[in-house]
Every structure is written in structure tokens, then in C-alpha cells.
């Protein structure tokens, strides 16, 4: 059968479902009927959501929605980095950094790209200076302008709205899903049906023909998009596509989460996500106006649910008997194929890795971008589906390996969880990257150090998502450094001297921003009209 796709059925709501409805509705320009079928009693997961910088350019700009508009509707705040706390020192779970070598046990994974000097990234000069005893300053504070403004809870935008650094967002996933529901149904003509799928009918070729709901209604379509979450209602249950478990790389499989009130006037609003190391995993903290979302991601092999709840609540001084808690079990891995026949899985029905680097929302719109790029007709050309599947496989596996490196290279060995992470095997590609890093080479160095060009070109960023800046922030932050400085620097005496001016310029920029930027709380009150 040939001819264009006329009908699309999205099964599942939540953030993934409504992002899919909005993105496809915009991309297809009214040439296909889109229906979103959502069970009325399925809760939306997520207690606070953190993102990455290309969300605006790759998703909201594509929809034509200004940043300030959706931010106000979704109680959104800004995120300039991830702050990793206590990933190097042994002890109880606490949001306060312990002492490490005379300073705090924390490091920032900031957005942005490392600057280059004489075609060598600044990271390599920093390590050369550190190796020769010329500096004891941590990598993040030496090479990036952001850490000092993060310490002071400054805004990444001035009160006139101008942007001074790269940033992402924190928001309430429920509010984003609701905002996109209104946008998709009111502006793009997406049909919204609340009903539960009871049966999936496949045709003689193995494709999905229709779904029947609990009320007896039948919905047929040319293309089915599975946004049903961890259930994988269409892709796994109906299409019987196997889910590839990745617990041999990542141990965490559970979470307990909640929201906590916060006194912004007294304490300010933090412009970063916190990732706090715990006995059997780690805890996120996602600040928003008046509260923060938080959750303990842990391994059920090393902590029972009761033990995790107790450790989590003790850290935030919460009563586990009265505090509303969201208890989550999740599968870590990806489908063997994200797209099978006329069924495409998007979001957690396709793949999932713990949110240590805030990739959940990114996985959704990256998959939507690839779906539109490889959009089929009714013949379902296997070349398109195979290419799409390779892109999703690479995206996930690359992120899985980067996340694993956080645990594998943490020097913590004080609990069975941290020791067990050292016994896992790194993927061959990841081991190659580490070997390059230790030999003084850059990993996935972008073609340019211009962050605006990098974040403004989704295709370029997708191909080079975890680059040298990311690896250096995390590996150096964990205390893993190259075996010796880059051999090239021994032949560049003028560059190794003149780079002092570059590091000095970073310090000047830090001082200027610290003196001139408003607090994030002040900026958000102006933006949100509070």
C-alpha cells in the first residue's frame, strides 16, 4: 500500500504524548488527522523536571511558542548547571557538601563549550597548569564563568531579558503536559479522547490495524505512536518487540519522590539541579518558585523501599508517615527497535535511563525530530525505519555510557552500591573514550567553540551530544585526570604562557557577572509577575 499517512493515533498522554501531538501537529501542517487517546486514570510521572538548553530552539521555537510564555504557564525556572554533591567522599546522604582537600565536595557540570586557545581546548591547559603545580583551582571554577554565579544564586538573564550564559529549565511536568494539551487541541486541531485501550488488533502483515477501548470504541490509523510509558502497551505488548535490559551497566531501578515547600525570600532560588550522592544511589533536587521537586534514585539490590524512604526523608527532615511520596519502579534500557512496522515508541515506552543528566525530555523531542526527518508514507519504507532505529539506538547507548561513567569513576567505595558499580563492565566505545582522555586527547571535540552555533544546530548537537566539555566536567570533577599533560603542549611554550590571559579573562568575567546580575529569585518574580 502506498499514499500519504492520513491518520495518526497517539496512545498515552503525559509529557511525551502531548509533546508528540504538538510536534507532529505542527510538522504535518494539518495534512493528517491526529488523535491522542489517553487513559483517564493514568498519573503523569515526574516530581519536577530538568532539561537541557536546546529545548527552546529544537522544540518550543519549532512550535512558535516564546520562552517567557510557556515559562509563566508552567511555573518554570532556570537551570545553568548540575551540581554534583558528595560524589567523592564517604558518608550519609546530605545536601551539604562535605570537606574534600580543604574545599567542598562538589563540582558543576555547566552548559556551554570549552574555549580554545591556539586550537587546544582550555581543559588541556588547566590540567597542564595543575600537573606542574601552577594552580590548585578546580577545573570548573578555572575554565567556566558560571560556578561563581551559581554559588551566589544569580540569574542567567539580566532584568532587561538579555542572556549572559547558556541555560536550560526546571518545571512542573504536569503543567507542561497541560499547556501542550491546550496548544495541540486549540491551535493544531488534535483530537483528545479519554478512554482506556483494551485490545490491539493487528493485520495480516503484523502491523497495528486498530485499537479497541474500554467503552467499545474502535480507533484505526496509518501510524501509531506509543507514548504509554513503561508499559509499552503497543510496542512491547502488541508488537512483541523485546526490551533490552541495561542493568549490567546501570544498577538503579527505583525512585521515591516528592515536593517540598521552599522559602524563596529567605533562601533564594538555586539556578541548578542538584545530584546528591546517597548510600545506594543519588537524589535530585529541582528548584522551582516556592518549592522544589526531589527524588531518591536507588538500586533495589542494595536498599529496600522502606530503607530508601527513611534515608530520603531523614535528609530533608520529612515525616515518612505524613509526607506524600511517589514510589516508582522503572526499567532501564531500550527497545531493540524503537520503530516496528507502523508503531513508533516515544518517551519511556521506547527507552529510559535515570535522569542524572536530565535527558528524559530530550529523548522525546530528539525522537520526534528523527521521526519527522524519516517520516514515511503508507508503504513504511524499511530504509526509513532502520535509519530511525539506528539513530535512537546510538542516542540512548551514548547516554547510557556517559551516565555509567559517573558511578564507575566515582572514588566512593564506602557502601556495597558504590563498590558494585566498579565491578560492572564499560562498553567498548566508552573504554576507548576514557583511554583517549587519559592520553590527553579531546573527546568528541565540536567543530567550533561557539555555543550559540552549537545549541542552534540540532543536527550538529545530536551527532555530537556528549562532547569534550561534558566529559571533562564530569571526569575531572570526580577526580579522574589524564595520566600526563597533552604532549603537544610541550612544543607550544608561547601558548602555555599566553593562556594565562585567557584564564584571567574568565576571572574578570566572573567578577563582572557577580556584580551585575540579579538574583534568580528577583528575575523570576519579575518574569512571572509575582
UniProtKB/Swiss-Prot annotation:
Keyword Transport: yes or no?
no
Sorted alphabetically, the keyword list is: FAD, Flavoprotein, Nucleotide-binding, Oxidoreductase
* Protein EC: 1.14.19.9
Task: Quote the record's binding site residues for FAD.
Answer: 13, 15-16, 39, 41, 49-50, 197, 348, 361
Question: Which residues bind L-tryptophan per the record?
Answer: 357, 454-455, 461, 465
Q: Site Important for activity: which residues?
A: 357
Catalytic activity reported: L-tryptophan + FADH2 + chloride + O2 = 7-chloro-L-tryptophan + FAD + 2 H2O
The catalytic site is made up of: 79
What class does this enzyme belong to in the EC scheme?
Answer: oxidoreductase
**Which of this chain's residues are annotated to bind chloride?**
359-360
Q: Which family does it belong to?
A: Belongs to the flavin-dependent halogenase family. Bacterial tryptophan halogenase subfamily.
Subunit text: Homodimer.
Q: What else is known?
A: The reaction between FADH(2), Cl(-) and O(2) produces hypochlorous acid (HOCl), a powerful oxidant. HOCl is proposed to react with an active site lysine to generate a chloramine intermediate, which chlorinates the substrate. However, studies with the tryptophan 6-halogenase ThaL (AC A1E280) suggest another model: the conserved lysine would not form a chloramine intermediate, but it may protonate HOCl during the halogenation reaction.
Q: State the protein's purpose.
A: Involved in the biosynthesis of the indolocarbazole antitumor agent rebeccamycin. Catalyzes the chlorination of tryptophan (Trp) at C7 position to yield 7-chlorotryptophan. It is also able to use bromide ions to generate monobrominated Trp.
PANTHER family assigned to the protein according to its UniProt record, in alphabetical order: FAD-BINDING PROTEIN, FLAVIN-DEPENDENT TRYPTOPHAN HALOGENASE
The protein's name: Tryptophan 7-halogenase RebH
Q: Which organism is it from?
A: Lentzea aerocolonigenes
What is the phylogenetic placement of the source species in the record? Bacteria, Bacillati, Actinomycetota, Actinomycetes, Pseudonocardiales
Please name the gene that encodes this protein.
rebH
Amino acid at each position: 500500500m502506498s499514499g500519504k499517512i492520513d491518520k495518526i493515533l497517539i496512545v498515552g498522554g503525559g509529557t511525551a504524548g502531548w509533546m508528540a501531538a504538538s510536534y507532529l501537529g505542527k510538522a504535518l501542517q494539518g495534512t493528517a488527522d491526529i488523535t491522542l487517546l489517553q487513559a483517564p486514570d493514568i498519573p503523569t510521572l515526574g516530581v519536577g523536571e530538568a532539561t537541557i538548553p536546546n529545548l527552546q530552539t529544537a522544540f518550543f521555537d519549532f512550535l512558535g511558542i516564546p520562552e517567557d510564555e510557556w515559562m509563566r504557564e508552567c511555573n518554570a525556572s532556570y537551570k545553568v548547571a548540575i551540581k554534583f554533591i558528595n560524589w567523592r567522599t564517604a558518608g550519609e546522604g546530605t545536601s551539604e557538601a562535605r570537606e574534600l582537600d580543604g574545599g567542598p565536595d562538589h563540582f558543576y557540570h555547566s552548559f556551554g563549550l570549552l574555549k580554545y586557545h591556539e586550537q587546544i581546548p582550555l581543559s588541556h591547559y588547566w590540567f597542564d597548569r595543575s600537573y606542574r603545580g601552577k594552580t590548585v583551582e578546580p577545573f570548573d571554577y578555572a575554565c567556566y564563568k558560571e560556578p561563581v554565579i551559581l554559588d551566589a544564586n544569580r540569574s542567567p538573564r539580566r532584568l532587561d531579558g538579555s542572556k549572559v550564559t547558556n541555560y536550560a529549565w526546571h518545571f512542573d511536568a504536569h503543567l507542561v503536559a497541560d499547556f501542550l494539551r491546550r496548544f495541540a487541541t486549540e491551535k493544531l486541531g488534535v483530537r483528545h479522547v479519554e478512554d482506556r485501550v483494551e485490545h490491539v488488533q493487528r493485520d495480516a502483515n503484523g502491523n497495528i490495524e486498530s485499537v479497541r477501548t474500554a467503552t467499545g470504541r474502535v480507533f484505526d490509523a496509518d501510524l501509531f505512536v506509543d507514548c504509554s510509558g513503561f508499559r509499552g502497551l503497543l510496542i512491547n505488548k502488541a508488537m512483541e518487540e523485546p526490551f533490552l535490559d541495561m542493568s549490567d551497566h546501570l544498577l538503579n531501578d527505583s525512585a521515591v519522590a516528592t515536593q517540598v515547600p521552599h522559602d524563596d525570600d529567605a533562601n533564594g532560588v538555586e539556578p541548578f539541579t542538584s545530584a546528591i550522592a546517597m548510600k545506594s544511589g543519588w537524589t535530585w533536587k529541582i528548584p522551582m518558585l516556592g518549592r522544589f521537586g526531589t527524588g531518591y534514585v536507588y538500586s533495589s539490590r542494595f536498599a529496600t523501599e522502606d530503607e530508601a524512604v527513611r534515608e530520603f526523608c531523614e535528609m530533608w527532615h520529612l515525616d515518612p508517615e505524613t509526607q506524600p511520596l511517589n514510589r516508582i519502579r522503572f526499567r532501564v534500557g531500550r527497545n531493540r527497535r524503537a520503530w516496528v512496522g507502523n508503531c513508533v515508541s516515544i518517551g519511556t515506552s521506547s527507552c529510559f535511563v535515570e535522569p542524572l543528566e536530565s535527558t528524559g525530555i530530550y529523548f522525546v523531542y530528539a525522537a520526534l525530530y528523527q521521526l519527522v526527518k524519516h517520516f514515511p508514507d503508507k508503504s513504511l519504507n524499511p530504509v526509513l525505519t532502520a535509519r530511525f532505529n539506528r539513530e535512537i539506538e546510538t542516542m540512548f547507548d551514548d547516554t547510557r555510557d556517559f551516565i555509567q561513567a559517573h558511578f564507575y569513576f566515582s572514588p566512593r567505595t564506602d557502601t556495597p552500591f558504590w563498590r558494585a558499580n566498579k565491578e560492572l563492565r564499560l562498553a567498548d566505545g566508552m573504554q576507548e573514550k576514557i583511554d583517549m582522555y587519559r592520553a590527553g586527547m579531546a573527546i568528541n571535540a565540536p567543530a567550533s567553540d561557539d555555543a550559540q552555533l552549537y545549541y542552534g544546530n540540532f543536527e550538529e548537537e545530536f551527532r555530537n551530544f556528549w562532547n569534550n566539555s561534558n566529559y571533562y566536567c564530569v571526569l575531572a570533577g570526580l577526580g579522574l585526570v589524564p595520566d600526563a599533560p597533552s604532549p603537544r603542549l610541550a612544543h607550544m611554550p608561547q601558548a602555555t604562557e599566553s593562556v594565562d590571559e585567557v584564564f584571567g579573562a574568565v576571572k574578570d568575567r566572573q567578577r563582572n557577572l557577580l556584580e551585575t546580575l540579579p538574583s534568580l529569585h528577583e528575575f523570576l518574580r519579575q518574569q512571572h509577575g509575582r
